[in-house]
Amino acid sequence: MADNRIAGSLPTSSKWSFLPKSVSSHFKPSSNPRSSNPDIENAPPQNPNIHNPRNQSVSSKSTAYKNQMDSPNCRSQVSASRPRAISALKTRNEVEEEGASNPHVKVVVRIKPTKEYCWKVKKVSKVSYSVRDRHFTFDSVLDSNLNQDDVFQQIGVPLVRDALSGYNTSVLSYGQNGSGKTYTMWGPAGSMLEDPSPKGEQGLAPRIFQMLFSEIQREKIKSGGKEVNYQCRCSFLEIYNGQISDLIDQTQRNLKIKDDAKNGIYVENLTEEYVDSYEDVAQILMKGLSSRKVGATSTSFQSSRSHVILSFIVESWNKGASSRCFNTTRTSRINLVDLAGAGTNERDATKHCVEEEKFLKKSLSELGHVVNSLAENVHPGISDRSLHKTSCLTHLLQESLGGNSKLTILCNIFPSDKDTKRTMSTLRFGERAKAMGNKPMINEISEEDVNDLSDQIRLLKEELSKVKADACHSVGSKNDYFGAKNARESLNQLRVSLNRSLMLPKIDNDEEEITVDEDDFKELHLQIKSLRGSFNQKLKKFPVNRDSVNSSFVTAFGESELMDDDEICSEEVEVEENDFGESLEEHDSAATVCKSSEKSRIEEFVSENSISISPCRQSLILQEPIQSESPKFRDSLRKSIALSSSCLRNQNSLAKSIKSTCFAESQHIRSSLRGSKIFTGSTESLAASLRRGLDIIDNPMNPASNRCSVSLSSDNLTMQPPTDDRLPLSPLCPTCRICSSKLPSVVEGDGYHMEGVLEKQQELEKLCSEQAAKIEQLTRLVGQHKLQTEDETEKLMGASNGERLPSANENQLLSCITETYDVKQISDDDSKKTDFDIGEKEALLKEIEDLKKKLQTPVTMSTNELRSSLLARSFQLRSKNAEKDIEEERLRCTEMESEWISLTDEFRVEIETQRTRAEKAEAQLKQEKLSSEELEDALRRAVLGHARFVEHYTELQEKYNDLCSKHKATVEWITELKKAVAKAGKKGCGSRFAKSLASELSALRVERERERDLLKKENISLKIQLRNTAEAVHTAGEVLVRLREAEQSASAAEEKFNEVEEENEKLKKKMEKLKRRHKLEVVTIKKSLKQNTLPESALQPLHQRNSAIEEEGM
């Protein structure tokens, strides 16, 4: 099959088209394949058993070396170190048991046979060897007598075993030029398409991939009830002069190395081909090796001048028969590294060759530096990332050198006296690399890990969408998401996905032949009779109910499952509203009891090797789940927070309303879930998540309702808990509220203050009546005083001595004046205490002044002194009282100011507390919004998961219906067969029936072959169409990427053009300024010339001289 496929897909004429002329001329098959030039690096080594006349000069030395290697001790050592061919891989437990003996870094030395005399390699101990009186530690040494199959058994078989176990593996071929590195790794180009044989010349890589694919097929066959899927992809790159090139797609050159947390270290835009057989890998190897850079050196005229790395990734998925998704996923990487040796070409010393040799020596020296630093590291397995980034080779081999990989270093040496220095450096490199500490791990992801990482993936997807949205909105930025760089990356991903879509399953071309004989027919007849007898016996033991549905499916593990819808649906459990989880558990337990009872009965029935066939009816059609609304907070709950007493008063009722609405919505959700709870066993996780969500919805309402609210009363500025019977305050500012609180007239409904006001009014009325009586007395006294003063004036005029004595009337007048002043003072004091109008006070003062005037008019000159003394006393009293009033007013103002300051401070503190409370409320509101969004997301995902469950069950229902129809068809066919057999038995023509049955089967086989051929043709045409569409999509993507690049170049050119235009405008402005300056200078010069006093005759010679100079210049 494999040969036919290769011959059909790749003809012999085109096999050599991948190779250059210089290489293909040497590697084409000939009559004597051993007669190739031994100076070529990829040529097979010379067999010492074949006679060669060129070796006669050194025959004695070579025979001595041959005799030493053919000694029984050496033969026993070689046979002991050579493992036998492994027919099947060991299990994972055996691999772990051998982990102690299997080192993570293995060093193997292979010796290339030489024509000249070579020095000896002595084995000192199990892992120690002596070369020219120096001891080295290696895992094994392969001498020149061992062939390619021995190298594969030593290196390749453990590598394939580790790769299929989930480990990363690497093989690094190191050595000088002409030591056989390329031959050991790849073998001759013509041997890749040969059949594998122990004595063949196939290299290590082809043998590894042949065994790998054969073991994959064997694992698929041995999987039993498990479903095992494998997917392999391959990439091939070259490092030449410090630049990375793609050997599969040669248009991809100068590629960059990227390092991120998701993909690790990878090469950008590197082609990865999906392969499913060894032939695909062989084509990639032939194409890549034909494009590798080769050149002539001092040791061989065709030597590798570049490093090549072949990366092969194996992904496997294991899925059990009972599980719905994959249980484990393994990913392993195989890196095959072929390094170029540092050799000079003495004949050709051009600049290109010198630069080539410089880069090779630099990369190898950087590799040696990394190996030395890792070997001397105190903590093995821990490597500095900056250490590996010194060159492309060490950067790509970061995981292989001191990382998560099992490394095998193949040191190829050429033991001759000419290259002793390079041989010893190769051995020292292998010994240092042996001391590196790699930490390989099994790259396996289980189902539990996937469940744990699902939330992280969801969050990362949200962040990615946000980043993409931000990148799309940022127009004109350099890091645009739709730039040419990102477009190129998306094109590469599209190409990978197209290659993956082309991976169609293979068609099994094995032809099935059905041969029918009379003996087979007799055996079938006996089996039918035995089954009929056992069926009748079981019918007697177990009566079958025709109405119920009893359909059993026997799986690959021998387990039986029963779907009894009538019995499961008949058991209904009453679900209480307050205990949703217990109802689910009760329903689940009831369903499991029914299933277990029916399962035990069926297992007893099946255990006795009998089959019961009963007519099946279709089960009920699965209904879709009822759409349940997610618990959202209404818009009228708390959109904003107002710092008022009314909002604080209504907070309890608001919390109650929130709680009632959430309770109603939770009841609605429960009822919807109760109605959609069809498959209880599969919805346990959904019920648990919804139960937690309902608890979260119900619980946050309690702290919101228990918050204590605070109100500001007008009586005293203290924080008091609110009461339900408080009156709403008027919408006034705090200052107006305080002023209104001080006025007793504003206070309503306070009896104590009203009584005080009435008492004060009565007192004021009494004072007014007393003052009115005093005023009347004063008027009477004034009248009497007038009469007395007239009499006294007459008496005084008649007196001669001019002295007078104060009379009783004068004393009485003085007492009246003082009494009026006291009444005035009392009235003033009362006016301060009372709320008299200003008009009444002025009227009283006017009356007092009128009285004073009336008193002053009748007073004569003799009473001037008395009046002046009385007035002075009154003025003194008034000044003292005024000063006291001013001081009292000042004290009162200061007290009021202090009260206002204290009130403002208290109000400021109150505002700050209310502000902090509002901020806390806003934060809590945001948290509640976030929790509500998370709950909505959880419910949405739960509903989607439930819908997927329903879809899955509908698919199962359709499959079940198909199986029922097939079962009915088989039952009908068996009944017809039974009838035919009975008729043939009665007539005695069994042989004729057998012949007719054979003819029917042959006719069916012919029809099946025709259908198969048609399907093959359709499959081929579909593959061709798929490839054509893939090529068309790829070309369209390439066109789009180039258009994007052209747009970017055009935009860059436009920007440059705009910049040039701006510069031109600036230059034009500068020219205009210079012209203006020049005109001004010319005008000034002309003015200065006009103002010059020299005559014109003196200026004419100068003018003539200038004109002559201008003519000569012309």
UniProtKB/Swiss-Prot annotation:
Where does this protein have coiled-coil stretches?
761-791, 872-942, 1038-1081
- Keywords from the named record: ATP-binding, Coiled coil, Microtubule, Motor protein, Nucleotide-binding
Could you name the domain of life of the organism this protein comes from?
Answer: Eukaryota
What is one cellular component GO term in this UniProt entry?
microtubule
List the SUPFAM superfamilies hit by this protein, alphabetically.
P-loop containing nucleoside triphosphate hydrolases
Instruction: List every stretch annotated Disordered.
Output: 1-84, 1092-1114
Q: Per the database record, which ranges form the Kinesin motor domain?
A: 104-436
Q: For this chain's UniProt record, which GO biological process terms are given? A: microtubule-based movement
Q: Name one GO molecular function term.
A: microtubule binding
- Biased composition regions of type Polar residues, renumbered to the chain: 10-39, 48-80
Residues the record lists as binding ATP: 175-182
Q: Family assignment?
A: Belongs to the TRAFAC class myosin-kinesin ATPase superfamily. Kinesin family. KIN-12 subfamily.
Protein name in UniProt: Kinesin-like protein KIN-12F
